[in-house]
């Protein structure tokens, strides 16, 4: 009997087919919603886990390539699985495993017809993202990209009967397709006019574009993928689409879909284009800094918990672009060790963000499911009614805040190390920019922790701000398992950075020919450059914290046992506290709103002097919307009104339009 070798690419292709089949089964079984939630979504989760295992399998392997007998006459579909694709498949499979398990419980209350269609869209969305990561020609890539975009649009507009949700979906689809046009133009530039067969990625690698055309391709890629990732100023769809979408969909979009754009930037910049220019890195670094600082500032003043997380995603995407920009700069100037360090930091943070942001988004789904409320100003005290959700979301909050020993600290620490270890470069302007960039990254990290204190404290601590919260219930069993898996991922990625970086070396070796091979001193200590400069051991840190807590507890019980008593604290005659006396989400963000006032468009309404029920109302709007997008909208409406003059209903004039067009084409074409 012949034994057929199964390649990782074969396994990844089988996963995509299984997701599509599960989606179709969900549509067929729409009259049995319990079967969809109890069988289809858990099965989809197992398929996700299989994809993550496939990615781990392929990470250290030689790239595998397949040509399918489908596509255009002279351009069959090409698939490729290399270490870069494998890394993002691990991210996709690992994060979607937890989200799919959570979805099995979250969507139980949805009606059968809607649930069946959502199940199809959900699994097509996953399949589309996987195909994006495996595509090895422009045609296959754009087909997968559009599959991902359209399926996510339909997921965002699940509750399409709500006008605001339809508007959010339209805005998302519009910006997604503007970005897709830029990506298509980028592929056209890299194809170099050599026929349809040159649209394969192998042909683009061998094209050797001039500096001018390579720069044009890079700018188009940065704009096109930046629109999907939420870079300034194409970020406006995120805070609209995420609140509109069901929470598991928000988790997939923020935790995974945004990373497909990062994948696209990495693939084109370091793989397809080959040599880079120093100013590409400066542009990416500056744009990333602006995106990170702007995103975290706006997150600080949000009252809607899902909008807050959406702006937080903008901040984290900015951090990723900062790492990519640093990598380009160091690589161009031959500082390959530091280029590997900054690229490793960016890749590590990409993986970390997939886990902790997915965890936080599905956690807000549990809160929304239990309370029916997204406004943090109406929540509070939920730690007593939702202890499981509170404990697991605390892991995500500590991770995104960059506190050791959780995963967010490792990637942010590596990024700061890349700044701190930066040598003198031949370009004096870059030498001046890097310290400023490091300071802004530190500011963004501090503000991110501030935002998460607000997020967790307002929602879970204190007293309930509404009477209805007394009846809130904790997450169900499927939801707890999904939350627990993602929380476990945050802890594991934080405690085992040496193992993670050893796997990331396969990716950095592919992209820049350099890894952090000597980044470990044993398996306990992470030393990015050498032990004399910086080292970090999350296990020792955790043991030290636990040791201090243990010694403190033993000391208290040894010397004060029997003399401790519990009682109300003396509060200087302060009366009984009510829920209205607590800090609000708006009040917590007030210092940021005032300090960075020029960045916001602030509108406020103050009560009159004789108002018997005075209330203060304020809002902080995005200046980009009013300065950029609103004028574009007004110009478009004006042009449309002029074009409408041609739509007068007179047939003979319509025929004359056709005749004039034909004459022009015959004359000039």
Residue ranges and their predicted role:
Residues 1-14, 24-120, 193-208, 506, ...:
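Transmembrane helix-loop-helix hairpins at membrane boundaries of multipass inner-membrane proteins
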Residues 5-14, 77-91, 131-143, 278-283, ...:
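Membrane-entry segments of alpha-helical transmembrane domains in multi-pass membrane proteins
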Residues 22-23, 49, 95-96, 187-188, ...:
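Hydrophobic core segments of alpha-helical transmembrane domains in multi-pass membrane transport
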Residues 42-56, 176-187, 393-405, 483-505:
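Hydrophobic alpha-helical membrane-insertion segments
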Residues 64-73, 200-206, 337, 411-427, ...:
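Membrane-interfacial helical/loop segments at transmembrane boundaries in membrane proteins
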Residues 79-93, 211-225, 429-445, 522-549:
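Hydrophobic alpha-helical transmembrane segments
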Residues 98-141, 151-475, 497:
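Hydrophobic transmembrane alpha-helices and their helix-loop junctions in integral membrane proteins
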Residues 499-547, 554-669:
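Aromatic-capped, Gly/Pro-kinked transmembrane alpha-helices
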């Amino acid at each position: 009997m012949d034994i057929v070798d199964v390649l990782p690419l074969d396994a990844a292709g089988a996963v995509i087919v299984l997701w599509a089949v599960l989606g179709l089964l969900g549509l067929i079984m729409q009259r049995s919603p319990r079967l969809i939630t109890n069988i289809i979504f858990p099965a989809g989760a197992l398929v996700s886990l299989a994809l993550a295992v496939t990615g781990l399998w392929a990470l250290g392997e030689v790239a595998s390539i397949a040509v399918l007998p489908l596509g255009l006459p002279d351009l069959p579909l090409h698939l490729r699985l290399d270490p870069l694709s494998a890394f993002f498949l691990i991210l996709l499979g690992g994060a979607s495993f937890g989200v799919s398990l959570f979805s099995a419980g979250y969507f139980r209350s949805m009606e059968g017809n809607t649930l069946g269609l959502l199940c199809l869209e959900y699994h097509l969305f996953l399949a589309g993202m996987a195909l994006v990561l495996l595509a090895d020609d422009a045609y296959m890539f754009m087909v997968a990209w559009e599959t991902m975009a359209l399926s996510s649009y339909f997921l965002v507009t699940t509750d399409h009967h709500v006008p605001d949700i339809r508007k959010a979906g339209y805005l998302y689809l519009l910006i997604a397709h503007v970005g897709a046009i830029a990506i298509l133009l980028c592929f056209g530039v890299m194809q170099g006019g050599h026929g349809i067969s040159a649209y394969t990625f192998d042909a683009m690698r061998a094209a050797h574009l001039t500096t001018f055309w390579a720069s044009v391709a890079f700018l188009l890629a940065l704009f096109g993928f930046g629109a999907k990732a939420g870079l300034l100023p194409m970020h406006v769809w995120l805070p609209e689409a995420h609140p509109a979408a069901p929470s598991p969909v928000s988790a997939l979009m923020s935790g995974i879909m945004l990373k497909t754009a990062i994948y696209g930037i990495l693939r084109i910049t370091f793989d397809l284009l080959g040599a880079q220019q120093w100013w590409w890195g400066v542009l990416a670094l500056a744009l990333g800094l602006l995106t990170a600082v702007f995103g975290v500032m706006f997150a600080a003043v949000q009252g809607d918990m899902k909008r807050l997380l959406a702006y937080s995603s903008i901040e984290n995407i900015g951090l990723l672009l900062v790492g990519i920009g640093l990598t380009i700069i160091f690589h161009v100037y031959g500082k390959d060790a530091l280029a590997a360090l900054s690229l490793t930091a960016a890749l590590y943070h990409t993986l970390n963000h997939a886990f902790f942001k997915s965890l936080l988004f599905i956690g807000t789904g549990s809160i929304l499911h239990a309370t029916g409320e997204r406004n943090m100003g109406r929540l509070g005290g939920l730690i007593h009614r939702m202890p499981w959700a509170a404990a697991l979301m605390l892991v995500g909050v500590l991770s995104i805040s960059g506190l050791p020993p959780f995963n967010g600290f490792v990637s942010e620490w590596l990024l700061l190390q890349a700044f701190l270890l930066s040598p003198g470069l031949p370009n004096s302007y870059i030498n001046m920019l890097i310290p400023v960039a490091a300071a802004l990254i530190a500011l963004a990290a501090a503000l991110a922790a501030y935002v998460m204190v607000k997020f967790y404290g307002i929602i879970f601590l204190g007293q309930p701000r509404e009477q209805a919260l007394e009846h809130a219930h904790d997450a169900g069993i499927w939801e707890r398992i999904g939350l627990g898996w993602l929380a476990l991922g945050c802890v594991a990625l934080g405690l085992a950075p040496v193992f993670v970086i050893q796997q990331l070396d396969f990716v950095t070796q592919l992209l820049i020919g350099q890894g952090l091979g000597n980044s470990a001193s044993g398996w306990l200590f992470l030393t990015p450059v050498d032990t004399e400069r910086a080292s970090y051991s999350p296990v020792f840190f955790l043991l030290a914290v636990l040791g201090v807590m243990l010694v403190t507890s033993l000391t208290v019980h040894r010397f004060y046992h029997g003399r401790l008593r519990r009682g109300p604290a003396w509060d200087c005659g302060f009366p009984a506290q009510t829920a209205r006396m607590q800090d609000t989400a708006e009040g917590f963000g007030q210092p940021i709103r005032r300090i960075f006032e020029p960045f916001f468009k602030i509108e406020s309404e103050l009560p009159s002097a004789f108002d018997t029920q005075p209330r203060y109302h304020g809002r902080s709007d995005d200046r980009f919307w009013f300065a950029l997008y609103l004028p574009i909208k007004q110009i478009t409406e004006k042009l449309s009104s002029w074009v409408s003059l041609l739509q007068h209903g007179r047939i003979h004039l319509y025929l004359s339009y056709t005749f004039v067009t034909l004459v022009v084409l015959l004359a000039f074409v």
